[in-house]
Design a protein with these regions (language model features):
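Short alpha-helical segments that sit at the start of domains
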Residues: 281-311
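Mid-core helix/loop region of P-loop NTP-binding domains shared across ATPases and GTPases
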Residues: 4-11, 18, 49, 92-213, ...
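Conserved catalytic segments around the Walker B and adjacent sensor/switch elements
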Residues: 53, 76-92
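Walker A/P-loop nucleotide-binding motif
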Residues: 47-72, 93
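AAA+ ATPase "lid" subdomain C-terminal helix
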Residues: 240-245, 253-267, 303-308, 325-327, ...
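Conserved C-terminal helix/linker of AAA+ ATPases
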Residues: 258-283
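Terminal-proximal interaction/regulatory segments of ATP-powered molecular machines
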Residues: 306-387
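A short, basic N-terminal segment
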Residues: 1-50, 72-75
Length: 387
């Protein structure tokens, strides 16, 4: 996928900067890949289910390493005449047990009905697929803390799958991915299946490590001599505070797009600075696109109210939400549903909702944006809703 500026190509393959792209080579994550391979070796050698827990901050490679691992593991299993399949479910996008289980079943049968089956019935359907295919399934739950904080029973059901269904020929392994250690929040029964020794930790990337990661992406995504070493160093310096490779790659892509828009022959430091100004590490494209449309509309309403003030009440936010619904031709949801959306946005870290303190009449909830500037959030949401 080649993209050209005036007289000179910029992007050789912009897809290599996508969040969905899984590179073969993952600099500075060899240790974590080897740890997963060691943990799951008994699955191939003795047909024993395994569970693992990957923990680390945003942009430290957890999701990419897990994707690379399951793809490689499936190939290795095939060489040993074993059938292993995987599914990766983002729990920010599917926040209930039912939604997660439906996503798992859709990997076996895309026509499986969205409604009409209870969770036990869905688990039974999964068992039948596994038995019929003589397969083992690795279920990767990304952002698993969202599900766990909602008191999920599904993780327990999956980790005890063999016991629940009398050890079917196909069985299930579970990989949990989270930014924080959620083991203390698991109920004792579920916790017993996740040993501390099964935890794989992902530390922040250093500036030098970010340089290596960016250099790899530059080679595959851009044409030669478009991105200099100085530009790579500058982006790594910017992202080094959080050690966030995802943020670094997003700045790299945005800087390239700005150079393209300005008909430049190469990416220069000014495009990097401009890209940083419009790219917030906590509000990546992936995060916003993970929200369904109604939640994005609620978030837009809140952001607009908070552009010039520190806090907004739920009543004020709901009034602004009604205006946004009218603007985008959407049906306004009832207060109960609005409140649920607000709780989800709080749980996901987009807003902070807390009881009002002194100086306010009656009991109400006040909402704030503590980590994200309102203006770029508004612009990103408006662009997203316009698509």
């Amino acid at each position: 996928m080649m993209v050209r500026a005036s007289g000179r190509p910029i992007f050789q393959d912009i897809r290599k900067l996508s969040f969905d792209y899984v590179p073969e080579r993952m600099p500075h994550r060899e240790k974590q890949r080897e740890a997963l391979e060691t943990l799951f070796r008994p699955l191939l050698e003795a047909h024993v289910s395994q569970n693992a827990f990957l923990v680390g901050q945003v942009g430290t490679g957890k999701t990419h390493v897990s994707k690379r691992f399951v793809l490689d593991f499936e190939r290795e299993a095939a060489r040993k005449n074993r059938t292993v399949r995987h599914v990766l479910v983002n729990c920010r996008q599917r926040m209930t047990d039912d939604a997660v289980l439906l996503a798992i079943l859709k990997t076996w049968d895309e026509r499986f009905p969205d409604r009409g089956f209870s969770i036990p019935e869905k688990l039974s359907a999964l068992r039948k697929h596994l038995e019929r295919s003589h397969a083992h399934m690795i279920v990767v739950l990304d952002e698993a803390d969202v599900l766990i904080r909602k008191s999920s029973d599904l993780i327990y059901a999956l980790t005890r799958f063999d016991e629940e269904y009398e050890a079917p020929r196909g069985s299930v392994s579970v990989v949990l991915i989270s930014q924080r250690d959620v083991l203390p929040f698991l109920d004792p029964a579920t916790l017993s299946t996740f040993r501390r020794s099964n935890m794989v930790e992902f530390g922040k990337y250093s500036q030098e490590e970010l340089v290596d990661i960016l250099a790899d992406r530059v080679k595959t995504a851009f044409f030669p001599d478009v991105v200099s070493e100085d530009v790579v160093q500058l982006i790594a310096d910017i992202a080094a505070e959080g050690g966030d490779a995802r943020y670094a790659i997003e700045i790299l892509q945005k800087a390239g797009e700005l150079a393209l828009d300005e008909n430049l022959r190469e990416v220069n430091p000014e495009q990097v600075r401009e890209a940083r100004a419009v790219t917030h590490a906590l509000l990546s494209r992936e995060s916003l696109e993970g929200l369904d449309r109604p939640k994005r509309m609620v978030l837009l309403a809140i952001a607009r109210k908070l552009e010039k003030k520190a806090y907004v009440t739920t009543g004020e936010a709901e009034e602004a939400y009604a205006v946004v619904c009218e603007e985008y031709g959407a049906n306004k949801r009832r207060h109960t549903q609005f409140w649920k959306y607000l709780q989800d946005l709080d749980l996901l870290g987009f807003v902070v909702a807390k009881p009002s303190g002194e100086g306010m009449t009656g009991k109400t909830t006040i909402i704030s944006l503590e980590d994200v500037p309102a203006k770029p959030l508004i612009e990103s949401l408006e662009a997203s809703l316009a698509r």
